Amino acid sequence: MLEYSVKARRIDDHGSLATTKQAEVMLDTDMSGRDDAFNPAELFLASIAACMIKGIERVTPMLDFNLRGVEVKLHGIRQDSPPKMVSINYEIIVDTDEDDRRLDLLHKNVRKFGTISNTVADAVQLEGMIMRTRDPATSK
């Protein structure tokens, strides 16, 4: 079993700082919002994206899957009362020449073995798709 620890502290009424290991992330905890930091909802979505990308990094060697890059786009919908995320849609965009069957296999592995995405999927509607950035027939 793995364990994780993060500490966050208020800097001032405009922001907070989260730390773990030797890393820091500025948090938007300003009631008016701020453009130079992730607010809690954006940080939540970024955590899902990081989980998916890390999952891809984990399974590509096992699948002998070749790629040049990955981008994950997420869109969350929040209800007001009580405030919570009710659905999250994602697109995983892979720069690869692998065929559709292999791309689907990558997607299945990412969804099956993602700690954060599995946790979220138990609580919120999490749906999405995987696609490639290049058409294999024209990218050679």
Which stretches of residues belong to each language-model region?
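Extended beta-strand/beta-hairpin segments
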Residues: M1-A46, I56-K140
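Alpha-helical metal-binding/catalytic segments enriched in His/Glu/Asp
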Residues: C51-M52
